[in-house]
């Protein structure tokens, strides 16, 4: 299983949100390029970078910074505000390894399909963020500010028909809380769609959580807040 460090960007700084809330932001003193270089030296094979300003505004704001981070030598999957073919092509042409498409996949499936066809499915990661109400994982959009009526399973089934294989799934209730991932959700995801390369994000506390996710068949795990709090030796995980 691939371990992917995450870097969230806001106004050019490394930050973390609690449960996706923009009114609960923790800023970190380390600069994004320094953070990317740190992960590169530890042996990370990939970074997950989110432009929170872009996610909120609907247009990526920090592409130049993200490209500078990728010059450290780590392939980057990046998202936050990619909501047009022009923006997707700009990111792809700038050298971003994989584009992370979130809200657009829910609000504008036709445009999302055009982007998939233009960029190629293997270069796309769908980021599907859910709130689990009455045991049904419903998708949130626009930087988690709004809820949709679409379920995770409906959307995955739809995009699977267009060649999508990489899906990043976050249970918002777990994100930034350090209380453990939603293992039931990921177990269902792998059982329902075993051919999808699932990436798990949110709530990972320690090595046992990663071991459990691996045993469920998850392809990759995104690590965020815990890496700033030294809860885990990342170098050991990456070896």
Curated annotation (Swiss-Prot):
GO cellular component, one term: cytoplasm
Biological processes per GO annotation: L-histidine biosynthetic process; L-tryptophan biosynthetic process
Reaction catalysed by this enzyme: 1-(5-phospho-beta-D-ribosyl)-5-[(5-phospho-beta-D-ribosylamino)methylideneamino]imidazole-4-carboxamide = 5-[(5-phospho-1-deoxy-D-ribulos-1-ylimino)methylamino]-1-(5-phospho-beta-D-ribosyl)imidazole-4-carboxamide
Keywords from the named record: Amino-acid biosynthesis, Cytoplasm, Histidine biosynthesis, Isomerase
First-tier enzyme category under EC: isomerase
Coiled coil: none
Molecular function (Gene Ontology), one example: 1-(5-phosphoribosyl)-5-[(5-phosphoribosylamino)methylideneamino]imidazole-4-carboxamide isomerase activity
Pathway membership, UniProt: Amino-acid biosynthesis; L-histidine biosynthesis; L-histidine from 5-phospho-alpha-D-ribose 1-diphosphate: step 4/9
Main location per the UniProt record: cytoplasm
Active site per database record: 8, 129
EC number(s) stated in the UniProt entry for this protein: 5.3.1.16
Annotated InterPro entries: Aldolase_TIM, His_biosynth, HisA_bact_arch, Isoase_HisA-like, Isoase_HisA-like_bact, RibuloseP-bd_barrel
Protein location: Cytoplasm
HAMAP family: HisA
Family of this protein: Belongs to the HisA/HisF family.
Protein name listed in UniProt: 1-(5-phosphoribosyl)-5-[(5-phosphoribosylamino)methylideneamino] imidazole-4-carboxamide isomerase
Organism: Legionella pneumophila subsp. pneumophila (strain Philadelphia 1 / ATCC 33152 / DSM 7513)
Organism taxonomic ancestry: Bacteria, Pseudomonadati, Pseudomonadota, Gammaproteobacteria, Legionellales
Gene that this sequence comes from: hisA
């Amino acid at each position: 299983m691939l371990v992917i460090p995450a870097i969230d960007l806001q106004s050019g700084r490394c930050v973390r949100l609690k449960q996706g809330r923009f009114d609960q932001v923790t800023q970190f003193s380390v600069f994004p390029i320094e953070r990317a270089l740190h992960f590169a030296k530890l042996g990370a094979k990939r970074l997950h970078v989110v432009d929170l300003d872009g996610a909120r505004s609907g247009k990526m704001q920090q592409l130049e910074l993200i490209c500078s981070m990728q010059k450290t030598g780590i392939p980057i999957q990046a998202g936050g505000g990619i909501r047009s073919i022009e923006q997707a092509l700009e990111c792809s042409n700038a050298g971003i390894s994989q584009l992370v498409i979130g809200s657009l996949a829910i609000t504008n499936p036709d445009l999302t399909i055009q982007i998939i066809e233009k960029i190629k499915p293997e270069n796309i990661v769908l980021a599907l963020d859910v709130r689990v109400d009455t045991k049904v994982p419903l998708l949130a959009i626009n930087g988690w500010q709004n809820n949709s009526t679409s379920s995770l399973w409906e959307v995955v089934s739809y995009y699977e028909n267009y060649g999508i294989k990489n899906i990043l799934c976050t249970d918002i209730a777990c994100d930034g809380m350090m209380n453990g991932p939603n293992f039931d959700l990921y177990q269902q995801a792998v059982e329902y769609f075993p051919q999808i390369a699932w990436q798990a994000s949110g709530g990972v506390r320690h090595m046992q959580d990663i071991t459990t996710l691996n045993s469920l068949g998850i392809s990759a795990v995104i690590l965020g807040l815990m890496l700033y709090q030294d809860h885990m030796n990342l170098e050991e995980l990456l070896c």
